[in-house]
Design a protein with these regions (language model features):
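N-terminal pre-ligand scaffold of iron-sulfur
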Residues: 1-60, 74, 78, 87-104
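Short Gly/Pro-enriched loop/turn and capping motifs at secondary-structure junctions
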Residues: 71
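Short Gly/Pro-enriched turn/cap motifs at secondary-structure boundaries
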Residues: 83-84
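Short cysteine clusters
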Residues: 45, 65-68
């Protein structure tokens, strides 16, 4: 199946400065709202599989997994600080009215 944008949630459901987990076609995805810009990525730390929405602390575009201290850039998924060494998968996001669409 080719990737396509699907409506995932309403933007109003994700307050600025927060990270929320949603299920999109059976994939658990975390969505971060950084000052009105939305980023989507796998809701699983690549170190020990903690939920990034549940255990993540967002500071600007840096998400820290409080399970063990790994840091990720929510824009790219890149690891900024260990112990994680593998980036998180990111998903393209677009806005349609109040709907947030994620490409899966």
């Amino acid at each position: 199946m080719a990737a396509e944008f699907v409506t995932a949630t309403k933007m109003s459901e994700i307050p600025s400065g927060s990270v929320t987990a949603i299920d999109v076609r059976g994939i658990r995805i975390a969505v971060a709202n950084v000052g009105g810009t939305y980023y989507a990525f796998d809701d699983e730390c690549t170190h020990e599989q903690c939920s990034l929405a549940e255990y993540g602390e967002l500071a600007g575009t840096t998400l820290t997994c409080t399970c063990h201290g790994s840091e990720f850039d929510v824009r790219t998924g890149k690891v900024l600080a260990p112990p994680a060494t593998v980036p998180v998968k990111v998903y393209p996001v677009r806005v349609a009215g109040d709907a947030l669409e994620i490409e899966v």
